[in-house]
């Protein structure tokens, strides 16, 4: 008898799995190995990661998305107002299953430098990469979704996608099979269809129904802040390869490069001020944005003098430790109908996994956008969970077992919790004009900017 090759064996296993699923579906609910609830950026990336893994080729994977497949016939002329800062680590994940090539074929803007500075003093910190390296990439969320969807459609033999499929309820199996109840998670859809899955992955956002239905608790608070987003046109064309962020007393404002002539605005402020910014006329809005980046009205003479003394001392002892200050570009106009706002908050699930369920992305953690880490944390979850599921499949283990799911939870919480705590601390530290705190953060920021090894560690952690 002729031996089966690896690809032939994989096809045979997949056919057996699919025929088993059809047989079960003829007498009861279809059974899947993995069901992903939520087809956003993180959920679709999870589907792509599983669909491309050689150890999972014979597994039945389903992606449930409540909305329609978004039409994307051609690249829009205007930029979307919702963008993400993609780290090199996230780009590596997207490249590993082919989605990054689709993004490169559409559009993205690399940046090589980041400058962060205080509106209440001259303190700043800069992050630079080597001349040939990109520090990160600004990509429109719609383009990321389209790239992932295109790649997923190439994996239709391995991953099934159900659009317009909203889950109504979930039924959980007992921790130990008693032989009476189904050993799988049961999903009831709005159209009356029922599905069974050995592992349910919740990628359904910060108001996750999966998390709530599983009884998984979360810690949360509202910042009483809103993010205002808009697409801005610059006064003149530049290389525009710097990401700018200034900490105002009312909240951080960021200018992220989209092209040589356009940038994306993300301004965190009070809900009342956000409403004003969204509704004011274009000329007033542009003047307000330029003033937010250029005005020194919040400067304190005492704080500025103290900061200058420290800067001089640091420059004397470490003359090559800090990069020169650059001036941000001037804004000439705002793209019509690009202004919008959304509320901000922090949320963290106390547990990412339970028997036959795992949370990823915003379903597990929601963070302030000031560090640009939200979707990157989600992509980190995808890479980690896909790795552990691949190992489980290779070892012949049950994908829904808590054994390897706990390894995922431990690894991701060790990364996510310190990052979320640091972002929350920064938000609170810069949300005041109290002189002692302003002086403390001014001295701390300048000292950090002078210590290249410390900055390299920060960049390495944030780039994962």
Swiss-Prot record:
Main location: mitochondrion
Organelle transit peptide residues: 1-24
InterPro entries the record matches: FAD-bd, FAD/NAD-bd_sf, Ubi_Hdrlase_CS, UbiH/COQ6, UbiH/COQ6_monooxygenase, UbQ_mOase_COQ6
Catalytic activity, as annotated: a 4-hydroxy-3-(all-trans-polyprenyl)benzoate + 2 reduced [2Fe-2S]-[ferredoxin] + O2 + 2 H(+) = a 3,4-dihydroxy-5-(all-trans-polyprenyl)benzoate + 2 oxidized [2Fe-2S]-[ferredoxin] + H2O; a 2-methoxy-6-(all-trans-polyprenyl)phenol + 2 reduced [2Fe-2S]-[ferredoxin] + O2 + 2 H(+) = a 2-methoxy-6-(all-trans-polyprenyl)benzene-1,4-diol + 2 oxidized [2Fe-2S]-[ferredoxin] + H2O
Gene3D superfamilies reported for this sequence: FAD/NAD(P)-binding domain (3.50.50.60)
NCBIfam families registered for this protein in UniProt: COQ6, Ubi-OHases
Name of this protein: Ubiquinone biosynthesis monooxygenase COQ6, mitochondrial
Species assigned in the record: Xenopus tropicalis (Western clawed frog)
């Amino acid at each position: 008898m002729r031996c089966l090759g690896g690809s032939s064996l994989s096809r045979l296993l997949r056919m057996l799995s699919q025929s088993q699923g059809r047989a079960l579906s003829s007498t009861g609910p279809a059974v899947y190995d993995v069901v992903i609830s939520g087809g956003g950026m993180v959920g679709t990336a999870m589907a792509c990661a599983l669909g491309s893994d050689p150890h999972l080729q014979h597994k039945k994977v389903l992606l449930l998305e409540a909305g329609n497949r978004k039409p994307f016939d051609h690249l829009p002329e205007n930029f979307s107002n919702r963008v993400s800062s993609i780290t090199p680590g996230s780009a590596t994940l997207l490249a590993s299953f082919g989605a990054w090539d689709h993004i490169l074929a559409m559009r993205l803007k690399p940046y090589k430098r980041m400058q962060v500075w205080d509106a209440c003093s001259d303190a700043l910190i800069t992050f630079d990469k080597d001349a040939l390296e990109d520090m990160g990439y600004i990509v429109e969320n719609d383009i990321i979704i389209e790239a992932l969807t295109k790649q997923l459609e190439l994996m239709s033999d391995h991953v099934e996608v159900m659009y317009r499929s909203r889950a109504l309820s979930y039924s959980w199996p007992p921790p130990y099979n008693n032989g009476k109840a189904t050993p799988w998670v049961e999903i009831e859809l709005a159209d009356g269809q029922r599905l069974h899955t050995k592992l349910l992955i919740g990628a359904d956002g910060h108001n996750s129904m999966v998390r709530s239905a599983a009884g998984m608790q979360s810690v949360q608070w509202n910042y009483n802040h809103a993010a205002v987003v808009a697409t801005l046109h610059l006064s003149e064309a530049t290389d525009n390869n710097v990401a700018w962020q200034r900490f105002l007393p009312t909240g951080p404002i960021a200018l992220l490069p989209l092209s040589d002539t356009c940038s994306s605005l993300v301004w965190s402020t009070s809900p009342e001020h956000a409403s004003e910014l969204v509704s004011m006329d274009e000329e007033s809005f542009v003047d307000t944005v330029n003033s937010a980046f250029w005005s020194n009205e919040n400067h304190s003479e005492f704080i500025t003098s103290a900061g200058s003394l420290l800067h001089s001392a640091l420059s004397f002892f470490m003359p090559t430790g800090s990069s020169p200050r650059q001036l941000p570009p001037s804004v000439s106009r705002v793209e019509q109908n690009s202004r919008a706002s959304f509320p901000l908050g922090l949320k963290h699930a106390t547990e990412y996994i339970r028997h036959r369920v795992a949370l990823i992305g915003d379903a597990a953690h929601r963070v302030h956008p000031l560090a640009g880490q939200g979707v990157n944390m989600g992509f980190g979850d995808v890479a980690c969970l896909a790795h552990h599921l691949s190992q489980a499949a290779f070892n012949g283990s049950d994908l829904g077992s808590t054994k390897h799911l706990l390894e995922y939870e431990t690894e991701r919480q060790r990364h996510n919790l310190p990052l979320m705590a640091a972002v929350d601390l920064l938000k609170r530290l810069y949300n005041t004009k109290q002189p002692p705190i302003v002086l403390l953060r001014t001295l701390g920021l300048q000292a950090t900017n002078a210590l290249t090894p410390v900055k390299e560690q920060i960049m390495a952690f944030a780039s994962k």
